[in-house]
Amino acid sequence: MTTILRVEHTVSNFDDWKKVFDTDPLGRKKSGVRRYRIMRQLDNTSFVMMDLEFDDQKEAEAFAAKLRNLWVSAQGQKLVQYPQLRIVDPIESKEL
């Protein structure tokens, strides 16, 4: 069953944040990320949400720990404010 790591945070500059994200400093694929989706709030484009899909909870927890370490680094502190993580179990998804 798929496990999702939901990440929510405010970024100081979306374009700068996206450039760093695209360099993949944490090795998403190697860490077990199967798929991800990036979303922004319509009325606050500095608020970013991501869903990262993993095969299991252990991989999601390990990646969450890597994210926390990145956020406390100097680079992370310049780009990300008020980070929140949730590990969730998708119950149902349908295309209509």
Predicted regions and their residues:
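Short, low-complexity N-terminal intrinsically disordered segments enriched in polar/charged residues
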Residues: 1-3, 94-95
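Glycine-rich beta-strand-turn "strand-cap" elements at beta-sheet edges
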Residues: 31-49, 72-96
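Short amphipathic alpha-helical segments
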Residues: 13-36, 68-72
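Short, well-ordered beta-strand segments in beta-rich or mixed alpha/beta enzyme
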Residues: 3-10, 37-67
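Residue-level signal for secondary-structure boundary sites
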Residues: 15-17, 58-60, 93
